[in-house]
């Protein structure tokens, strides 16, 4: 339980547990696949202006955490015959949602224009790839 949505969802799936949201799932996010991020960081190193800053991420689609859970479940059913469901609960931590913004979406215009950054892997494919990776590396990750 590292409190990041996709890793927690993947753990729930691989353990055969329901995915539990500790909110209504309405906050929105964009989700950048790791290879796109690494390519972006590389482009900053090679093409970026020293001392300048660049937002690396993905700007579309912006989806709710609930939708991310639904996408995860859909892929998990296809890949692993997952039987779990999306359920809603509450955190015992009264401050759980205190610093949780309703929206996170980077403006990557500068990175696109100045260093040629262009993320390619959408959230649907990224979630599927991530679930496959987690399933292949699950035991090793649990040992750490």
Task: Give the location of each predicted region.
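C-terminal substrate-binding subdomain of Rossmann-fold SDR/epimerase-dehydratase oxidoreductases
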Residues: 11-144
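Flexible, glycine-rich beta-alpha linker
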Residues: 1-5, 27-28
């Amino acid at each position: 339980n590292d409190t990041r949505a996709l890793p927690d969802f993947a753990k729930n799936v691989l353990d055969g547990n329901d995915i539990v949201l500790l909110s209504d799932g309405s906050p929105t996010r964009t989700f950048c696949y790791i290879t796109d991020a690494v390519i972006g960081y590389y482009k900053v190193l090679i093409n970026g202006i020293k001392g300048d800053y660049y937002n690396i991420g993905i700007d579309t689609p912006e989806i709710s955490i609930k939708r991310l859970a639904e996408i995860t479940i859909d892929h998990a059913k296809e890949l692993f015959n997952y039987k779990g469901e999306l359920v809603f609960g509450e955190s015992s931590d009264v401050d759980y949602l205190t610093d949780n913004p309703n929206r996170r979406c980077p403006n990557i215009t500068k990175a696109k224009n100045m260093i040629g950054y262009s993320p390619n892997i959408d959230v649907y494919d990224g979630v599927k790839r991530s679930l496959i990776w987690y399933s292949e590396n699950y035991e090793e990750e649990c040992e750490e």
